[in-house]
């Protein structure tokens, strides 16, 4: 009896399985649930019209017509010239970049790895380094228009056998075809490349070296002002100056060396009286004799005070010392108080 029941059970299971197979074979045009048609795959869509994969945002960038037709007459086109439009567009670019950061930082990962491979930033005497990238481009006029890529490299270390630091800076410039960039070509056409190595010795002329035989040499004077900003930034970092908390003065020591100091250092140097720049009573007396009335003397003191302020603004150390010493010997107590109040305002309020 048990064998008979087992046989009947297996027979019924086999019968229903075949019945489902027979019913399904008649619907040849129906796609089995859970599979995806070839057309859907080619369109990148799932069966429920959802995306199979996340398309890269730059897959369908707009490619200018001038990249394909360099001779035809084109209708004039204009970007809206109101501030709100440009502000919103820059904001959209920033948001897109921040939300798809991994799509844009691959090159920086490679460059940082290259830097760290040659200069181990984990060494004990490593101080500071940076990799600064900038892309400059003007109006895209034709299929030969280019964009300029600038990469600045910097590194500094503490000397181990003597006092001081050692630093080096170089910049690489390359021109890339704008049409290739617009089409997101990995191997964009390079029209020119330049590598400049900056000497860190102020007394010497900058020397230039090339990366390979067909690299054009370029004089230091051709570097743009943005390179100067990177040098100023590196000087701030080297001197541990927080430019959000201190007013700073910048002095250009040479074409590639900038010295950054706190404003208070400038003022301390200005207001340090020595035998050479101390108050000269004879000079002051002669000046006052020319102004006999009280009104004339008052105007003279006001002029000194104005010149003193201007010398600070213009970073004129010689003029600052001269006018400060004259104020010290000519000003009344209230005017001296105004001087120090002015200095305090410069340091802590402006």
Curated annotation (Swiss-Prot):
Residues 1-24 form the signal peptide. The keyword Nucleotide-binding does not apply. It is found in: Membrane. Keywords: Membrane, Signal, Transmembrane, Transmembrane helix. Its main location: membrane. It is a single-pass membrane protein. Disruption phenotype: Formation of oocyst in Anopheles coluzzii mosquito midguts and development of salivary gland sporozoites are abolished. Transmission of parasites to mice following mosquito bite-back is abolished. Parasites exhibit normal development in mouse blood stages and normal gametocyte-to-ookinete transition. It comes from the Eukaryota. The keyword Transmembrane applies. GO terms for cellular component: membrane. The chain crosses the membrane at residues 330-350. Forms multimers, perhaps with an unknown protein(s). Involved in ookinete evasion of the mosquito complement-like response, oocyst maturation, sporozoite development and infectivity. Addition of antibodies against PIMMS43 to the infectious blood meal significantly reduces transmission of malaria parasites by A.coluzzii mosquitoes. This is Ookinete surface protein PIMMS43. It comes from Plasmodium berghei (strain Anka). The lineage of its organism: Eukaryota, Sar, Alveolata, Apicomplexa, Aconoidasida. The gene is PIMMS43.
């Amino acid at each position: 009896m048990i064998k008979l029941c087992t046989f009947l059970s297996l027979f019924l299971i086999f019968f229903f399985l075949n019945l489902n197979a027979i019913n399904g074979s008649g619907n040849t045009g129906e796609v089995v649930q859970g599979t995806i048609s070839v057309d859907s795959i080619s369109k990148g869509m799932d069966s429920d019209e959802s995306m199979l994969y996340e398309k890269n945002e730059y897959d369908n960038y707009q490619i200018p017509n001038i990249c394909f037709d360099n001779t035809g007459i084109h209708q004039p086109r204009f970007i809206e010239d109101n501030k709100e439009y440009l502000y919103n567009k820059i904001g959209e670019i920033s948001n897109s970049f921040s939300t798809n950061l991994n799509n844009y930082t691959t090159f920086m990962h490679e460059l940082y790895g290259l830097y760290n491979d040659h200069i181990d930033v984990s060494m004990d005497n490593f101080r500071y380094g940076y990799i600064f990238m900038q892309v400059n481009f003007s109006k895209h006029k034709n299929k030969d228009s280019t964009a300029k890529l600038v990469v600045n490299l910097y590194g500094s270390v503490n000397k181990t056998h003597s006092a001081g630091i050692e630093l080096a800076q170089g910049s690489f410039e390359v021109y890339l075809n704008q049409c290739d960039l617009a089409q997101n070509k990995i191997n964009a056409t390079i029209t020119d490349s330049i590598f400049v190595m900056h000497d860190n010795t102020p007394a010497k002329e900058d020397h230039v070296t090339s990366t390979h035989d067909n690299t054009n040499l370029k004089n230091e004077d051709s570097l743009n002002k943005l390179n100067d900003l990177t040098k100023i930034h590196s000087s701030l970092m080297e001197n541990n100056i927080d430019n959000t908390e201190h007013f700073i003065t910048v002095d250009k020591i040479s074409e590639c060396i900038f010295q950054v100091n706190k404003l208070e250092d400038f003022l301390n140097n200005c207001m340090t009286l020595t035998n050479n720049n101390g108050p000269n009573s004879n000079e002051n007396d002669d000046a006052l004799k020319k102004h006999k009335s009280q009104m004339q003397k008052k105007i003279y003191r006001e002029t000194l005070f104005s010149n003193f302020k201007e010398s600070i603004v213009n970073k004129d150390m010689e003029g600052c010392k001269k006018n400060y010493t004259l104020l010290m010997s000519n000003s009344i107590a209230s005017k001296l108080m105004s001087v120090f109040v002015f200095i305090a305002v410069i340091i802590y309020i402006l």
